[in-house]
């Protein structure tokens, strides 16, 4: 669930984009999968999580060093991870994009373009607490999923469709803009817990 792309921007900067998937395993304390419910609980509480350790290990393996320019993108648990990494102070965060992420316990400094997309019928973003952090632009809309389709409202595919609608809507003009450039070289990482 970890994708890392490195490239040289038009301005000559080495840039890294880190894409993080959501929860892969719903158990607590029994799975070797670090993107599990145990990591969800730890991340919402603001303490160390196995998924965070896995992402930072993947970043090191991809050649990312402290202080490097990094853009973080994530869905659900991956979005919460992205926000925590963006604010960790270990990287020069270029941007942050989260979708369906429970961000209520995260404090964002606002020193970079940041966008949180959520669905009004998705319960997961509310699991982080009722407050919405400052320092990030919030875009909320209905998912388009069925009336009682709670899982559908949180599905990555629904968020892809929402992002496509945002791209062509007038709301796009009020959202943060990112400049894409350079040829990216993707690397994919799968992590396992070694303590189980």
Model-predicted regions and their roles:
Residues 1-68, 90-196:
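Alpha/beta hydrolase fold serine-hydrolase catalytic domain that processes acyl esters and thioesters
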Residues 73-82:
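Gly/Ala-rich beta-loop-alpha elbow adjacent to hydrolase catalytic centers
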């Amino acid at each position: 669930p970890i994708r890392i792309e490195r490239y040289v921007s038009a301005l000559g900067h080495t840039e890294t984009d880190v894409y993080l998937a959501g929860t892969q395993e719903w158990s607590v304390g029994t799975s070797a999968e670090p993107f599990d419910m145990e990591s969800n609980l730890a991340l919402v509480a603001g303490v160390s999580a196995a998924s965070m350790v896995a992402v930072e290990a993947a970043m090191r393996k991809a050649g990312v060093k402290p202080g490097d320019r990094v853009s973080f993108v994530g869905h659900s648990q991956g979005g919460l991870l992205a926000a925590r990494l963006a604010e960790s102070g270990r990287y020069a965060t270029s941007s942050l994009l989260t979708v369906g992420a429970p961000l209520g316990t995260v404090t964002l400094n606002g020193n970079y373009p940041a966008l949180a997309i959520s669905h009004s019928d998705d319960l997961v973003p509310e699991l982080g607490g009722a407050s919405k952090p400052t320092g990030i632009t919030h875009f909320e809309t209905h998912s388009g999923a069925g009336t009682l389709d709670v899982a559908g409202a949180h599905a990555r595919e629904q968020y892809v469709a929402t992002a496509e609608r945002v791209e062509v809507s007038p709301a796009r003009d009020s959202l943060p803009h990112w400049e894409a450039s350079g040829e990216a070289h993707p690397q994919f990482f799968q992590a396992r817990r070694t303590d189980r």
